[in-house]
């Protein structure tokens, strides 16, 4: 099977949330079989920033669902959305 690179947007529940702590919690919650690549912060509006995460997963059935489910349960996370996917080379 090939690897798939996914760009995932994680929205914090508040503009006041400590994003460094949230990124540490997200990294700790990466499920088995998922390779964490990087985080970037993206300004949204009124001081709110999204965490853009890049991960690599197998192209098996379910794909990014384990990551989405695990990260949705992290305290301080409002939403988790896959922005883009593509094959890794």
UniProtKB/Swiss-Prot annotation:
One GO molecular-function entry: translation elongation factor activity
Disulfide bond residue pairs: none
UniProt protein name: Elongation factor 1-beta
Encoding gene, per UniProt annotation: ef1b
Record's function text: Promotes the exchange of GDP for GTP in EF-1-alpha/GDP, thus allowing the regeneration of EF-1-alpha/GTP that could then be used to form the ternary complex EF-1-alpha/GTP/AAtRNA.
UniProt KW keywords: Elongation factor, Protein biosynthesis
SUPFAM superfamilies according to UniProt: eEF-1beta-like (SSF54984)
Gene3D superfamilies: 3.30.70.60
Pfam families in the cross-refs: EF1_GNE (PF00736)
Family membership: Belongs to the EF-1-beta/EF-1-delta family.
SMART domains, sorted: EF1_GNE
């Amino acid at each position: 099977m090939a690897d798939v690179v996914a760009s995932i947007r994680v929205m914090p529940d508040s503009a006041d949330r400590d994003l460094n702590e949230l990124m540490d919690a997200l990294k700790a919650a990466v499920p088995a079989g998922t390779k964490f690549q990087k985080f970037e912060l993206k300004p949204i509006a009124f001081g709110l920033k999204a965490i853009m995460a890049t991960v690599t997963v197998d192209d098996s059935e379910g794909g990014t669902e384990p990551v989405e489910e695990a990260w949705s349960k992290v305290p301080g996370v409002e939403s988790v959305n896959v922005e883009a996917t593509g094959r890794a080379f």
